[in-house]
Amino acid sequence: MRIRRKKWAREELDNSKFYIDKPEEFKGKWQEKFDKSNPLHIELGCGKGLFIATLASKNRNINYIAVDMIEAMLGLSKRNIEASYDYENPENLFLIRANVEKISEVFDKTDEVERIYINFCNPWPKK
């Protein structure tokens, strides 16, 4: 599936309180980024964010990080997450832009990720 560029995505992400532009700066210290120390779950390849938006809004006692490498998808995720939280900033969820093939640059074993979700990611790398 090819996603068209969303001209508004970059600006909306930059102005979002739950988007992290440089996730590698938090490697090994993700729990410090959240207000509450809860179990940490991550979703790799969050796409439009419908899964993580629903999950995080219903389980506020778990901290979530949604990862995607496509800016347009993160922009759509941001909008879906805001709608799921009645347009308030989530306290238990962050969006980050990262390549899953280089996820070790963003997460460390000291981050103690309890669960990883991978739903319908693209298994065929482009050449």
Protein language model annotation of sequence segments:
Residues 1-42, 50-57, 81-110:
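S-adenosyl-L-methionine
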Residues 62-65:
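Short beta-strand element of Class I
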Residues 113-127:
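Mobile active-site "lid"/loop adjacent to the S-adenosyl-L-methionine
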Residues 77:
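Conserved SAM-binding loop
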